[in-house]
From Swiss-Prot:
GO terms for cellular component: cytosol. Belongs to the aldolase class II family. RhaD subfamily. This is Rhamnulose-1-phosphate aldolase. It is an enzyme of class 4 (lyase). PANTHER family: FUCULOSE PHOSPHATE ALDOLASE (PTHR22789), RHAMNULOSE-1-PHOSPHATE ALDOLASE (PTHR22789:SF16). GO terms for biological process: pentose catabolic process; rhamnose catabolic process. Its cofactor is Zn(2+). Keywords: Cytoplasm, Lyase, Metal-binding, Rhamnose metabolism, Zinc. Binds 1 zinc ion per subunit. The keyword Cytoplasm applies. Zn(2+) binds at H141, H143, H212. SUPFAM superfamilies: AraD/HMP-PK domain-like. The active site is at E117.
Length: 274
């Protein structure tokens, strides 16, 4: 029998959650991670599935995700513990044929359930599927320290925040030319914040929740982790620069344009115009 804990997707989730914990982005049960799979990914592991999978209805139907499997982190679970007991802290779920709910096929033992941010994840998956023609498969939410810190001192405006991050590190414009979406502060774990996040995900692969954390999307676990890591590194640089009295020189608008041309990306116009 094939052991699902040795599958590429369980091992990938273990690595991503462990790395995020070691970065200091996911204290206690902070953060959540979902990866969209294909039936072929889970086909070898049916013998590992629960004999009577639990069914959980969604708060709103998502027909775009019908019959789609995901691997998800659990509600109230600590990222630091995923590596110790994957079956207790992760779960493979599959949305039903009409997108009204999902079955827990594997993991989430002892009656555990998926992350409370599942509405935000699933809604964001829907938008990123449309925005990237199905290329994006990962949604990651974490409490990246310096990005959170900047939401207290920068104007919480997409153009302003994006431009500052682009100037904080040369690679940022290349990695996220579409900029960073920003929400107003909202209560987490609700359909409302999920809908607002998904709306920003139509235009941006990164979305900030002020005073809380960040959502990132990408085609793989590595790409999504790297996206957030890149933005967080720039935020760390900016926090240090501001604490030293602010910028005396920076990357100019003309240099940002040249950077975009060199790497074949189109920078967010509103950020470039500042």
């Amino acid at each position: 029998m094939q052991n699902i804990t040795q599958s590429w997707f369980v091992q990938g989730m273990i690595k991503a959650t462990t790395d995020a914990w070691l970065k200091g982005w996911d204290e206690r049960n902070g953060g959540n991670l979902t990866l969209r799979l294909d039936d072929a990914d889970i086909a070898l592991y049916h013998d590992n599935f629960h004999p009577q999978p639990r069914y959980i209805p969604l708060s709103q139907p998502m027909p775009l995700l019908a019959n789609t499997p995901f691997i998800v982190t659990g509600s109230g679970k600590f990222f630091r513990n995923v590596q110790l007991d994957p079956a207790a802290n992760l779960g493979v779920v599959k949305v039903d044929s009409d997108g009204a709910g999902y079955h827990i096929l594997w993991g989430l033992t002892n009656e555990a359930v998926p992350t409370s941010e599942l509405p935000a994840h699933f809604l964001s998956h829907c938008e990123r599927i449309k925005a990237t023609n199905g290329k994006d498969r990962v949604i990651m939410h974490c409490h990246a320290t310096n990005l959170i810190a900047l939401t207290y001192v920068l104007e919480n405006d997409t153009a302003v925040f994006t431009r500052q991050l682009w100037e904080g590190s040369t690679e940022c414009l290349v990695v996220f030319p579409d900029g960073v979406g920003i929400l107003p502060w909202m209560v987490p774990g609700t359909d409302e914040i999920g809908q607002a996040t998904a709306q920003e995900m139509q235009k941006h692969s990164l979305v900030l929740w002020p005073f809380h954390g960040v959502f990132g999307s990408g085609p793989t676990l590595d790409e999504t982790f790297g996206l957030i890591d890149t933005a967080e590194k720039s935020a760390e640089v900016l926090v240090k620069v501001y604490s030293m009295g602010g910028m005396k020189q920076t990357i100019s608008r003309e240099e940002l344009i040249a950077l975009g041309q060199r790497f074949g990306v189109t920078p967010l116009a509103s950020a470039l115009a500042l």
